[in-house]
A protein has these predicted regions:
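Short, hydrophobic/aliphatic alpha-helical segments
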Residues: 27-41, 124-136
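Short, charge-patterned binding micro-sites
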Residues: 33-51, 83-88, 92-93
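Short, small/acidic-rich helices and loops at N termini and domain boundaries
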Residues: 44, 48-66
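Charged, compositionally biased N-terminal leader segments and the immediate start
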Residues: 1-37
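Short, well-structured alpha-helical segments that form the helix of a local strand-helix-strand
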Residues: 68-76
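Structured, non-catalytic alpha/beta "coupling" segments that mediate domain-domain communication
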Residues: 76-111
Length: 150
């Protein structure tokens, strides 16, 4: 189990909560917004944070905090996945994943050693990576953007 798998499990749980709330008639949005999970700015705020409740506020015509409460109430496998789920105004969901899940990630890292995280993504193809550096002493202009695109 990798860190990406843990994030995928959390995302699946959040989508399950949204689907469950919709089936109960608590939410009416037809299509869910893109679900993003980010690391909070402070470690005490948890492992992952989501703004999905704020993304739904306009389409639901409700306060993000109320939507976040509905999501938390409908979270599947909440006790198995989360140590703590916190709602912070205006509607942030701060999620602390159970330590046992992170311990599984650490076990995988330890067992794979230096091979952890390696992938055969490019399959031997060469890739050229360039970056654009604008003149730091002059103003930015359209040519800088053109140089980045070409």
């Amino acid at each position: 189990m990798s860190q990406g798998v843990v994030q995928e499990m959390v995302a699946t749980a959040l989508l399950g909560a949204l689907d469950g709330a919709k089936k109960k008639g608590q939410l009416k949005t037809e299509a869910w917004p893109a679900l993003t999970l980010d690391a909070p700015k402070r470690p005490e705020w948890g492992d992952l944070a989501s703004t999905v409740a704020m993304s739904l506020a306009a389409s639901e015509q409700r306060a993000p905090h109320d939507i976040a409460q509905i999501i938390v109430e409908n979270l599947p496998r909440r006790e198995q996945l989360f140590e703590r789920v916190e709602i912070v105004r205006p509607g942030f969901l701060n999620l602390t994943v159970k330590p046992a899940l992170w311990q599984e990630v650490l076990k995988e890292i330890e067992s794979q050693g230096a091979a952890y995280g390696k992938a055969d993504l490019g399959r031997g193809r060469r890739v050229l990576v360039e970056y654009v550096s604008a003149n730091p002493t002059g103003p930015l202009h359209v040519g800088h953007g053109r140089g980045a695109a070409v």
